[in-house]
Swiss-Prot record:
GO molecular function list: calcium ion binding; calcium-dependent phospholipase A2 activity; phospholipid binding; toxin activity
Gene3D superfamilies the UniProt entry points to: Phospholipase A2 domain
GO cellular component: extracellular region
Tissues expressed in: Expressed by the venom gland.
Superkingdom of origin organism: Eukaryota
Binding annotation for Ca(2+): 27, 29, 31, 48
Catalytic reaction equation(s): a 1,2-diacyl-sn-glycero-3-phosphocholine + H2O = a 1-acyl-sn-glycero-3-phosphocholine + a fatty acid + H(+)
Matches recorded under InterPro entries: PLipase_A2, PLipase_A2_dom, PLipase_A2_dom_sf, PLipase_A2_His_AS
Cofactor: Ca(2+)
Official protein name in the record: Basic phospholipase A2 PLA-A
Function: Snake venom phospholipase A2 (PLA2) that displays edema-inducing activities. PLA-A is three times less active than PLA-B in edema-inducing activity. PLA2 catalyzes the calcium-dependent hydrolysis of the 2-acyl groups in 3-sn-phosphoglycerides.
Family, similarity comment: Belongs to the phospholipase A2 family. Group II subfamily. D49 sub-subfamily.
Organism encoding this protein: Protobothrops flavoviridis
Amino acid sequence: HLLQFRKMIKKMTGKEPIVSYAFYGCYCGKGGRGKPKDATDRCCFVHDCCYEKVTGCDPKWSYYTYSLEDGDIVCEGDPYCTKVKCECDKKAAICFRDNLKTYKNRYMTFPDIFCTDPTEGC
């Protein structure tokens, strides 16, 4: 669920996700096209691809269960949709954390009209 994803990102990065990531680069937030602008934007590209692979459910609105153990996200539960969705969100949140040093404020509200490179496939 998007609200759970928000909490994961906040825990992993310390940043407010809606401000910091909702409009970042060419892939963070709604939609996506062109080539990812940097490593953070690539996290969003990979997250979008991960969601595309989740079939038979709507990953954006599926609730899942997770916990934090020693600073690590642990996805819990059994149903396919929720477990896979949680893993997609977990990977993205960790990716954001791992790329904090290269986060660029200039991409924070990047207009998608500048995302003109050919779109990469998953």
